[in-house]
Amino acid sequence: MLCNLIHNIHKEGYIIIMISFLLSCIGFAISCSLGIIFLVASLLCIYFFRDPIRIVPEGDHLIISPADGIILNIEQVNSPIDNSTQVLCISIFLNVLNVHVNRIPVSGTIKATEYIPGRFISASLNKSSELNERQRIVIESNVNHHTIIVDQIAGLIARRIVCNAYEGQNVNSGERFGIIRFGSRVNIYLPLNIHISAFKGQTVIGGETILAYLEDYPHKQLTAKFI
């Protein structure tokens, strides 16, 4: 049971959880109430860094949500890597209770990664997409070689973005590629000429919810995998 619990915690949380449990032990040695406070903090850290297995729909034509959260906006904007190109931006806000592990939205190849320094205003504000610290990955999809861009955006509390993707990497939809700590935002930029199934206000699950289709799909039988 303990092994399963550890397996379902993201490695970025190991040190924080160990420190919080150590503090709870010290706290109990001082007073019961102090120990309980640190123990509760430890349990909250375990909850925050949880990394559950997801049932990922299979298909190179699928665009899967890269994060848990709620869709704040779906709007046409200039591409963040090419101002002359219009794309569709889906913005997903993650509160502190959401799973913060990020997943690859589409099968393909990582063409570029980029760290962009910035501020730490609330990730629920639209201007955070341009002003806040963020980490970007650019994916070329296996289907029709579309360019898909994902921005991990830091928030007011989230000041640690982890991205394990690297240029030239072949990736499959649903695979884990990073995490953002304590409340944040993920923007995904898609080409205009695809079928969008997501909608504003929708609650999405990273690695499970289908946001869009790169080609006509309706009569295709979907299968799934556990990741």
From Swiss-Prot:
EC number(s) on file: 4.1.1.65
GO-annotated cellular components: plasma membrane
The protein's required cofactors: pyruvate
Cofactor binding note from Swiss-Prot or TrEMBL: Binds 1 pyruvoyl group covalently per subunit.
Keyword Transmembrane belongs to the record: no
Annotated active site: 184 (schiff-base intermediate with substrate)
Site (Cleavage (non-hydrolytic)): residue numbering on this chain: 183-184
Predominant localisation class: membrane
UniProt KW NADP keyword: no
Protein's cellular compartments: Cell membrane
InterPro entries documented for this protein: PS_Dcarbxylase, PSD-A
Residues recorded as bearing Pyruvic acid (Ser) in the entry: 184
PTM info: Is synthesized initially as an inactive proenzyme. Formation of the active enzyme involves a self-maturation process in which the active site pyruvoyl group is generated from an internal serine residue via an autocatalytic post-translational modification. Two non-identical subunits are generated from the proenzyme in this reaction, and the pyruvate is formed at the N-terminus of the alpha chain, which is derived from the carboxyl end of the proenzyme.
Keywords: Cell membrane, Decarboxylase, Lipid biosynthesis, Lipid metabolism, Lyase, Membrane, Phospholipid biosynthesis, Phospholipid metabolism, Pyruvate, Zymogen
Pathway in which the depicted protein is active: Phospholipid metabolism; phosphatidylethanolamine biosynthesis; phosphatidylethanolamine from CDP-diacylglycerol: step 2/2
Membrane-protein topology: Peripheral membrane protein
GO BP of this protein: phosphatidylethanolamine biosynthetic process
Catalytic activity: a 1,2-diacyl-sn-glycero-3-phospho-L-serine + H(+) = a 1,2-diacyl-sn-glycero-3-phosphoethanolamine + CO2
A GO molecular-function descriptor: phosphatidylserine decarboxylase activity
Reported function: Catalyzes the formation of phosphatidylethanolamine (PtdEtn) from phosphatidylserine (PtdSer).
Similarity comment text for this entry: Belongs to the phosphatidylserine decarboxylase family. PSD-A subfamily.
Subunit structure: Heterodimer of a large membrane-associated beta subunit and a small pyruvoyl-containing alpha subunit.
Protein name per the record: Phosphatidylserine decarboxylase proenzyme
Organism: Ehrlichia ruminantium (strain Welgevonden)
